[in-house]
Regions:
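An N-terminal-biased, well-structured beta-alpha scaffold segment characteristic
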Residues: 1-31, 138, 158, 164
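Rossmann-like dinucleotide/phosphate-binding beta-alpha-beta segment
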Residues: 74-167
Length: 258
C-alpha cells in the first residue's frame, strides 16, 4: 500500500521488526545504524555482569524492605570479574567492545563462538575462537549473547546447552528476546544449575511480573535499555537521517541492510 515508499530507516541495529524479504522484493532499501549504540550496549552488559556477580540489585531491594540482620551477609557473597573466562556468543561490534572493556579493565580471557567470524579475524581481536558452542560454554565463567534474532538463532540457548554451563557461571542476554529460551533459563536458575543471569531483551516486552523469571532472586531484568543513553540516541538519530537522505539523493548508503 505504501506505493511512494522510498527507504526504511532503522533507528538502531536489529531489523527483526522489518519485513526484509518484502522490502527487497519491492526494491525498498533498508538502512540501519550498526555502530551508533555499540559503546552504550557494551557498557550496559558489563554493568549487568557486575550487578549479578555482586548481588547489587538484590541487596538494594532487600535493604529497602526487610533489611539484613548483619553487615556483609554470607548469602550475598559474590564473585569477582577479574581474570574470568568470558564466552562471547557472537563476535560483532558490541561483543568485541564489551570484550575490550573486560580485557583491559578486568584482565578477562576472551573466547568466542561465531560461524561468521574466521579464526584469523578472532585472533586479530584477541579472542580464542571455538568451533563448537557447547565446548566454549563448558570453558566459560561468564557468557554473553550478542546475536540477532533469526530462524537459526531462535532458542539458541536452551536446555540442551544450558546443561553445558558451569554451575557457577553467569549469563547475559542484551541482544534479542527469543535467542534464549526463557522457560529453560528459568528452570536452570531455579534449580541453581546456573549461578545467575541478566536480560535486557525478552520475548514479550517490556518485561513484567507475569514473566516467571521475575520471581527469582538470581535474575536481573532491564527493559531493553541497552541503547538508551543520551549519546547513543543522538548518534542514532543523526546517522539514520544522514543515511535516509543519502538514499533519497541517489548516493551510496554506508549501512544498507537490503
Amino acid at each position: 500500500r505504501a506505493v511512494n515508499l522510498k527507504v526504511i530507516g532503522k533507528h538502531g541495529v536489529g531489523c527483526n521488526t522489518i519485513d526484509l524479504a518484502a522490502a527487497k522484493e519491492l526494491g525498498v532499501p533498508v538502512i540501519n545504524t550498526p555502530f551508533a549504540n555499540t559503546n552504550s550496549v557494551a557498557e550496559l552488559i558489563v554493568g549487568l555482569m557486575l550487578d549479578i556477580s555482586r548481588n547489587i540489585s538484590v541487596c538494594d531491594k532487600k535493604s529497602r524492605g526487610e533489611g539484613f540482620s548483619c553487615i556483609a551477609p554470607p548469602e550475598m557473597t559474590g564473585i569477582e570479574l577479574t581474570g574470568k573466562a568470558v564466552g562471547l556468543v557472537g563476535m560483532g561490534n558490541i561483543s568485541r567492545r564489551m570484550g575490550e572493556i573486560l580485557k583491559n579493565g578486568f584482565n578477562a580471557k576472551l573466547m568466542g563462538y561465531d560461524p561468521y567470524c574466521s579464526k584469523e579475524q578472532a585472533d586479530s581481536y584477541g579472542i580464542e575462537k571455538f568451533e563448537d558452542l557447547n565446548r566454549m560454554l563448558e570453558a566459560s565463567d561468564i557468557v554473553n549473547i550478542s546475536v540477532p534474532l533469526t530462524p537459526s538463532t531462535e532458542n539458541l540457548i536452551s536446555s540442551g546447552n544450558l546443561n553445558h554451563f558451569k554451575k557457577n557461571a553467569i549469563l547475559i542476554n542484551a541482544a534479542r528476546g527469543g535467542v534464549v529460551n526463557e522457560e529453560d533459563l528459568y528452570q536452570a536458575l531455579k534449580h541453581r544449575t546456573l549461578r545467575a543471569a541478566a536480560c535486557d531483551a525478552f520475548v514479550e516486552e517490556p518485561p513484567s511480573g507475569k514473566n516467571k523469571l521475575m520471581t527469582l532472586d538470581n535474575f536481573c531484568a532491564t527493559p531493553h535499555i541497552g541503547a538508551n543513553t543520551e549519546e547513543a540516541l543522538y548518534r542514532m538519530g543523526m546517522e539514520v537521517v544522514e543515511e535516509v537522505l543519502n538514499v533519497i539523493d541517489g548516493k551510496q548508503a554506508k549501512n544498507r541492510v537490503v
